């Protein structure tokens, strides 16, 4: 699944993921603090924010989504 994400900054990669009922907008303060020294990727998990909806909502599927995103970004 192609997740919605934002990417800012440069340096070591930090992938930020929100908790239940959240979205990447919840990660703004943390992202702002990390951006001066890191490449920050903030992610909307499946069924959250602007990412696609799916009937499947479990940890293995969400983990695979993150692996796919990392592959797409050559991380």
PLM regions with names:
Residues 1-2:
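N-terminal cap/lid segment of alpha/beta-hydrolase-fold proteins
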Residues 6-53:
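Conserved HGGG/HGGXW glycine-rich cap/lid loop of the alpha/beta-hydrolase fold
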Residues 32, 42-75:
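Active-site loop/oxyanion-hole signature of alpha/beta-hydrolase fold enzymes
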């Amino acid at each position: 699944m192609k997740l919605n994400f934002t990417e800012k900054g440069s340096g070591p990669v930090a992938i930020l993921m929100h908790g239940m009922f959240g979205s990447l907008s919840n990660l703004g303060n943390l992202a702002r603090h990390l951006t001066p020294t890191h490449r920050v990727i903030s992610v909307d998990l499946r069924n959250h924010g602007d990412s696609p909806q799916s009937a499947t909502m479990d940890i293995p599927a969400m983990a695979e989504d993150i692996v796919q995103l990392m592959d797409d970004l050559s991380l």
